[in-house]
Every structure is written in C-alpha cells, then in structure tokens.
C-alpha cells in the first residue's frame, strides 16, 4: 500500500522516518531496514498495447488523466523481461492476426524462467496456430487469454529456488498465484523470520493466507507441525506439490478462509475439508499472517491473539496500524522490519514480531 497520502516518500530513509513516527505508540526501538537494488528488481510487469498507424507499442495509461505513455524500457523489471520485450514486440508487429485486438501483456519471471501472457478482445481459438508459432519461435512459455478462454503453450507453471540461511527451497507456481514480486526482498523477509525463530522456543505453527507455501516451506523445519490455510484451491495444489519438491512432511494444508478456521478452532462449526486434520493435536506457539491490503478482520484478530507469538507481514502500513491497536491489548511489538520492496516508490512492506504481554 502506498504512503503517498502522507507525503512524497521515495527513499527507504524517508519511509523509515515516517514509519518511526507513525508507529511510535507501538514501537520505539530500532527498526531493521532491508534495501533492494534500484534496477531490475521486479519479477512481474503488466503493460498495455497501443495501436497507431497499423503498428503496435507498449504503453501505460495514467489511471486519473488517462494520458498514455509509450514504453520502450522498464528499468525496474527483471533483466529477462527487459531483454524479451523488444523481441516480442517485433514479432507481434509482423503478424496482423496476433496484433489485432491485442490490448495487454503480463510478464512473470523467476530466477530460472520467464512466462508471457497476452490479453485479447477476441476469440483466441481463431489464432491458436499463430500463438503456437510465437511460443515455438521465441522459445517462450506463453499464455493467451480472452473472455472465458485461456490457451497455454509449453507450460504456465514456473519453477523458483530461494536461498534461505544456506538452504535451497524449491517452488512451483503460475501467474494466477499471489507472488512476492521482488525475489531478493522476499528472501530477506523469509530470512528475517527465520532469524527470529532461531531465538525462540517453538512448538507448532499456524499460518493464515499461505498461498503456494512461500513462507510455509522455509519455516516448516523450525516446528514440529504446521497448519497452513488458504482459500484458493490452485494455491493449495501448488503448496502440496512444493512439499514434495522439498521432501517436507510436517505441513498440513486446509482450504479454509481465516473466518472458517476461527469457527473450526472454536468448535462452532465442522468442515468436511478438515476431515483428515485433528485440530486438537496442534499446540501452536507461533502464528504467521500475511494478509491482503485490507488487513485482518476482527474474527481473525480474536483468533490469533490467543497465541503466544505473532508474525505479521504487511503490505499496508495503514491497516497494520489499525490491527496493532487491537493486538497491542494482549501483545507487545518486539521486532519491526521495513522492506523496500518497490524502490523509489511510496510503497513499503513491513514485518512485525509480537509476543504476549
């Protein structure tokens, strides 16, 4: 979430100075600051296409003024994206069927791979052979989408390897998953959590909003058992696959919303999706939450404040502060970290570790 409503904070020092004052009622110790390189850090990029005089350009549009900006290069994007952009544009310009009613493109990279998604306002079945030729000729994992349709050429799944405390963690996911878009900062976030856990007495972990297992796989060795919840079926399937990739056997995944889990733990409702999981067998010493921008609702706060230790990863300092007003009634902020996920922008990612008072 952007801090632009509070000021034009672009550098990490400026963001740090603001956050220090903004959270002073909860935390007065030193913040840990994690920097990012200022170019080629972002692994995801979305662009529009602009058509003029029978040719094609990458473009961005100002959401307020609707003014268009022709884009030739994205210095914040991963090097693989930057290298591929002109090759793709040149190919599309030479194929009238491919460029007709083409309105957008999404690039996604990992350390090893790249995938491209083309977005159309027409039936993509009519250009299936052209799309297949594009994928083969440019040696690219290609996805094409139009209303109600999706075509995949080669594969839509990407593989990723993260380096965490001298360990390699292996993942597979696709561009429908929520992905931390700055891999180096993602590794620093996970490592920060691991370093805290190294100093802690640990039993079992409860993780909400686990996605495809980004944190889960790296944290599992610190605990006897892990219960991780997520509402997306495809994310759960990737998380299970990622357990196999890492030979991890102590994680139990449940396709439940946080509100549903709260009802299940309080024994107010039974869920068929929990038929193979005995909640009474868990002794949670830690809970990890990485919620969407809206933060945690009251039912989730009421659930997690029962546990001794809370790790809160936040993409929105505003809702984080609101949630800390509730959590500070039972817990104290012990550690606060700032991650410069999007360099030279007002965006800031926060990590907070709380323990019971």
Swiss-Prot record:
Its EC number is 2.1.1.-, 2.1.1.35. One of its GO terms (molecular function) is tRNA (uracil(54)-C5)-methyltransferase activity, S-adenosyl methionine-dependent. It is an enzyme of class 2 (transferase). CDD domains: AdoMet_MTases (cd02440). It comes from the Bacteria. It catalyses: uridine(54) in tRNA + S-adenosyl-L-methionine = 5-methyluridine(54) in tRNA + S-adenosyl-L-homocysteine + H(+); uridine(341) in tmRNA + S-adenosyl-L-methionine = 5-methyluridine(341) in tmRNA + S-adenosyl-L-homocysteine + H(+). GO terms for biological process: methylation; tRNA processing. The keyword RNA-binding does not apply. Pfam families: tRNA_U5-meth_tr (PF05958). Keywords: Methyltransferase, S-adenosyl-L-methionine, Transferase, tRNA processing. The keyword Secreted does not apply. GO terms for cellular component: cytosol. The active site is at residues 315, 349. InterPro entries: MeTrfase_TrmA_AS, SAM-dependent_MTases_sf, TrmA_MeTrfase, U5_MeTrfase_fam. S-adenosyl-L-methionine binds at residues 180, 209, 214, 230, 290. Dual-specificity methyltransferase that catalyzes the formation of 5-methyluridine at position 54 (m5U54) in all tRNAs, and that of position 341 (m5U341) in tmRNA (transfer-mRNA). Belongs to the class I-like SAM-binding methyltransferase superfamily. RNA M5U methyltransferase family. TrmA subfamily. This is tRNA/tmRNA (uracil-C(5))-methyltransferase. It comes from Campylobacter jejuni subsp. jejuni serotype O:23/36 (strain 81-176).
């Amino acid at each position: 979430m952007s801090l632009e409503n509070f000021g034009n904070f672009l550098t990490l020092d400026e963001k740090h100075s603001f956050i220090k004052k903004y959270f002073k009622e909860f935390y007065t110790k030193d913040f840990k600051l994690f920097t990012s390189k200022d170019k080629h850090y972002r692994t995801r990029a979305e662009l529009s296409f602009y058509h003029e005089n029978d040719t094609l350009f990458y473009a961005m549009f100002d959401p307020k003024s609707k003014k268009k900006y022709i884009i030739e290069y994205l210095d914040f994007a991963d090097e693989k994206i930057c290298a591929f952009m002109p090759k793709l544009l040149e190919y599309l310009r030479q194929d009238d069927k491919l460029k007709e009613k083409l309105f957008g493109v999404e690039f996604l990279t990992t350390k090893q791979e790249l995938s491209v998604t083309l977005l159309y306002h027409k039936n993509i079945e009519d250009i299936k052979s052209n799309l297949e030729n594009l994928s083969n000729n440019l040696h690219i994992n290609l996805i094409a989408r139009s209303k109600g349709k999706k075509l995949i050429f080669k594969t839509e799944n990407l593989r990723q390897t993260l380096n965490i405390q001298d360990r390699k963690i292996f993942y597979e996911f696709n561009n429908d998953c929520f992905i931390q878009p700055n891999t180096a900062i993602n590794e620093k976030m996970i490592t920060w959590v691991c370093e805290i856990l190294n100093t802690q007495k640990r039993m079992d972990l409860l993780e909400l909003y686990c996605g495809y297992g980004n944190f889960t796989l790296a944290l599992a060795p610190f605990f006897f058992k892990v219960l991780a919840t997520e509402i997306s079926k495809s994310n759960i399937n990737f998380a299970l696959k990622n357990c196999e990739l890492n030979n991890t056997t102590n994680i139990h995944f449940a396709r439940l919303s946080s509100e549903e889990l709260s009802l299940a733990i309080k024994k107010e409702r039974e869920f068929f999706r929990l038929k193979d999981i005995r909640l009474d067998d868990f002794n949670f010493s830690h809970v990890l939450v990485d919620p969407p921008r809206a933060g945690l609702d009251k039912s989730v706060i009421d659930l997690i404040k029962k546990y001794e230790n809370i790790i809160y990863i936040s993409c929105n300092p505003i809702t984080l502060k609101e949630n800390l007003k509730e959590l500070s009634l039972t817990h104290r902020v012990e550690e606060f970290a700032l991650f410069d996920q999007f360099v030279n922008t007002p965006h800031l990612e926060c990590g907070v570790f709380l323990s019971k008072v």
